[in-house]
């Protein structure tokens, strides 16, 4: 494909991660931020011709979906015949942080990053995609669909893992705590997740402050213009698979179910990953995607659901 007509998409750089061939491109958003976009093509020509876009959560990056050793859900889906695309949201992984890193907001990623990713993937495949998001990656995806920043006709279906906004982080319900944390973040410029063992990436102060606004006492899940992301969930009509995990203390099942119930999809499924539903263990927030057990029972469950909707 001649990418010269798409000025916002670079030519690919070819990488090898543990024997897995990866194409790395840079794309440009409408507000002129540069994002890294990795692609793993279907293995051995076993192509289903359907793109799958994987959106990481907070404190995360490409390695959540494909490790440096070439292991991960992204590789598994490519082995199953899917055309896998792994973007890194601004300020994460190979997407540059830049001088204004501290000012990056959640809305920047919802309003600008996700549409740029959708445009790039569609430009290079001419095919609507499956979208999968973990944690805030899934929440951002739902928000973008809710207010129409993502084009619904280019989304085959969506899958979320541990994505919610209503529960967890109960300390933020105490106004003095929320105010103090916001003030500290403004001074620090970032949230040092790696030092706290929460993930490989620091998160911008702007993103953290915005999520505090959503979760604090009487907080509202809205855009900067006051548009409710909740209200538009009923407009999401494509098939949806919502995964929640029994031992997820970050984003518990009750919060995931609350969002799931608001979705307008007729074809929607809610699955709690735990022993009571026939799984080998009660999964937690990260282990529901990244663990040996997930590799054996969650990944095949997901792949089967996707294939049934081709």
Where are these regions (language model features)?
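Alpha/beta-hydrolase-fold enzymes
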Residues: 122-127, 131-132, 136-224
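Acidic catalytic loop of the alpha/beta-hydrolase fold
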Residues: 247-251
């Amino acid at each position: 494909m001649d990418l010269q007509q798409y000025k916002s998409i670079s030519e690919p750089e070819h990488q090898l991660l543990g024997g897995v061939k990866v194409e790395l491109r840079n794309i440009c958003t409408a507000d002129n931020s540069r994002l890294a976009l990795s692609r793993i093509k279907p293995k051995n020509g076993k192509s289903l011709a359907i793109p799958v876009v994987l959106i990481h959560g907070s404190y995360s990056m490409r390695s959540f979906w494909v490790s440096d050793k070439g292991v991960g859900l992204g590789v598994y889906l490519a082995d199953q015949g899917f055309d896998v695309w792994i973007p890194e949201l601004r300020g994460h992984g190979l997407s540059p942080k830049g001088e204004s890193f501290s000012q990056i907001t959640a809305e920047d990623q919802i309003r600008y990053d996700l549409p740029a990713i959708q445009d790039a993937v569609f430009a290079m495949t001419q095919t609507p995609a499956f979208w999968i998001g973990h944690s805030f990656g899934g929440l951002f995806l739902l928000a973008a669909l809710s207010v129409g920043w993502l084009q619904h006709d280019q989304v085959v279906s969506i899958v979320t893992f541990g994505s919610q906004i209503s529960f967890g982080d109960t300390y933020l319900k105490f106004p003095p705590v929320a105010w103090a944390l916001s003030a500290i973040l403004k001074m620090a410029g970032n949230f040092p997740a790696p030092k706290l063992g929460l993930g490989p990436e620091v998160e911008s102060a702007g993103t953290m402050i915005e999520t505090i606004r959503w979760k604090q006492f009487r907080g509202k899940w809205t855009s900067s213009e006051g548009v409710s992301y909740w209200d538009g969930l009923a407009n999401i009509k494509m098939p949806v698979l919502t995964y929640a995990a029994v031992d997820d203390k970050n984003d518990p099942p009750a919060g995931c179910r609350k969002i799931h119930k608001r979705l307008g999809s007729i074809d929607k499924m809610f699955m709690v990953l735990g022993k009571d539903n026939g799984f080998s263990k009660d999964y937690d927030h990260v282990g529901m995607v990244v663990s040996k057990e997930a590799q054996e029972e969650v990944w095949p469950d997901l792949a089967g659901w996707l294939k049934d909707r081709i």
